[in-house]
A protein has these predicted regions:
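C-terminal accessory helical subdomains adjacent to catalytic cores in phosphodiester-
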Residues: 1-9, 24-187
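Short acidic, Gly/Ser-rich segments with clustered Asp/Glu that frequently serve as metal-coordination loops
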Residues: 18-23
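Short, hydrophobic/glycine-enriched beta-strand segments
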Residues: 12-17
Length: 187
């Protein structure tokens, strides 16, 4: 994998379900490695974290109110309020941003198949969707951030098997997950 540190990305908004891992990895990649500007809002914390670096490449990371995919539509008021703050206080143009929903999918979480199918259909484009209401692309994996790390930065992954997302999370924790990001930054 080759990373182009000179590429400008404009504005990108990540909506995640987790409250720690996703924020840490996205920060390490977009701020530590690429030097982009960053705004983060975690649920259950009143403050926003901001790092201004590159005005042409800005990333915002927020999570849903609850750690479950159904919260995308069950609690839209929470995300609407967060989006309002991003627009007004941080001048982050939510409507002109690429929006990605990063959610896990394993046998013990996000098990409502009908709801997942609905989101896959309506959250299909990071900029605009058919319904004209809700932009964003759902990136559903097992678990999403950890799958990215394992598949890109660990050798011989074909020999690994994990039944649940928490198993892969524990595996990454044992091999010091941030050493993987430090390795990337040195490249």
């Amino acid at each position: 994998m080759r990373i182009n540190k000179e590429k400008r990305i404009g504005q990108v908004l990540f909506i995640v379900e987790g409250s720690s891992t996703e924020f840490n990895y996205l920060y390490k990649i977009f701020c530590g490695l690429l030097g982009y500007s960053y705004v983060a809002k975690k649920r259950n914390t009143p403050d926003y974290y901001v790092k201004d670096s590159d005005p042409y490449s800005r990333v915002a990371v927020v999570n849903t109110r609850e750690s479950n995919i159904r919260d995308i539509s069950e609690n839209p008021k929470y995300l609407d309020e967060v989006f309002d703050v991003l627009r007004e206080r941080y001048h982050f143009p939510v409507e002109q941003s690429a929006i990605y929903y990063l959610f896990d999918r394993d046998p013990e979480s996000n098990t409502n198949i009908e709801l997942i199918e609905k989101y896959i259909k309506i959250l299909a484009n990071p900029y605009d969707n058919e319904d004209g209401e809700q932009a964003g692309q759902l990136l559903l994996s097992y678990p999403s951030i950890e799958s990215f790390i394992v598949s890109n930065f660990i050798d011989e992954t074909i020999n690994l098997y994990f039944g649940l997302g928490k198993e892969v999370k524990n595996y990454i924790g044992k091999i010091n997950r941030f050493s993987l990001i430090k390795f990337l930054i040195k490249r």
